[in-house]
């Protein structure tokens, strides 16, 4: 392992001890916000510190075994050879583990996310597929014990959605769902197709991380145009009697957000502002990424949200992810929410990219 990496690990070990000492300080304990922040930092350091301590112990074991090789006793030398072999194997495994633990982490991976699904080319069939995608993501969220809250929905006449926006809350939501941003294409025979011809339709999926209130970018109220209107869709007679739905236009960027799922205008406004902040932050994040990543490709579809990332071919029961040339003949399971079969290889590929970039530094 490079000495620069060892130095970084030693610094993290030292920081871990500092944080542990501070967590036992009465002044820190009385300051809830600081105590919470330090507890989070300690938790984040835990895995890398544990692995580095094991690495240091394995290095000591190797040195001890090398000393034993100088013994006159043949049996002791044989034992030393076995111990050296075992220590080297542990060191090799821990080096790989520590390299991964040191990879730069997306600070937004642990945040909640806004999932937006929009029907694209394909008319009614695209809207029906948007409904299928929403069902797929709902099942995936359910399996992960994540909460799904509908923010805004525009239903299509023949089923499915022209657009649906939901907030997904839970542990590590954005870290997994962010890989879903991009164009999703479906190839299948629509129920309305009498000739049995395969049609191609498309939907766009956008995943934005929620911006915590404390970190929310400042939005000038003067830059906002707020309209109220009567909500449409399900909800009984109430939706036809009050102007509870909200449409907010951010004039400088042209971003428009609508929320009408809540019965209260106040709640709809709060949700709309939340989505607006996430979209504006996404633009800022993309500007920063573009500046930082001039050469390294990113697996997370970012600026070009129309970029096709996946094709769902129903006649062949096939799902293809075009970013990593992965094809799986498990369409039924995937549409039932088994997204890990797709996400895990993508995340490993992304990890490999980061490791390659780290090696070049």
Curated annotation (Swiss-Prot):
GO MF: translation release factor activity, codon specific
Pfam name, any one: RF-1
PTM description: Methylated by PrmC. Methylation increases the termination efficiency of RF1.
Superkingdom field: Bacteria
Family annotation (InterPro entries): PCRF, Pep_chain_release_fac_I, Pep_chain_release_fac_I_sf, Prokaryotic/Mito_RF, RF-1
Compartments where found: Cytoplasm
Modified residues (N5-methylglutamine): 237
Gene Ontology CC: one annotated term: cytoplasm
Keyword terms: Cytoplasm, Methylation, Protein biosynthesis
Function, in words: Peptide chain release factor 1 directs the termination of translation in response to the peptide chain termination codons UAG and UAA.
Similarity comment text for this entry: Belongs to the prokaryotic/mitochondrial release factor family.
Record-given protein name: Peptide chain release factor 1
Native source species: Shewanella denitrificans (strain OS217 / ATCC BAA-1090 / DSM 15013)
Name of the gene this protein is made from: prfA
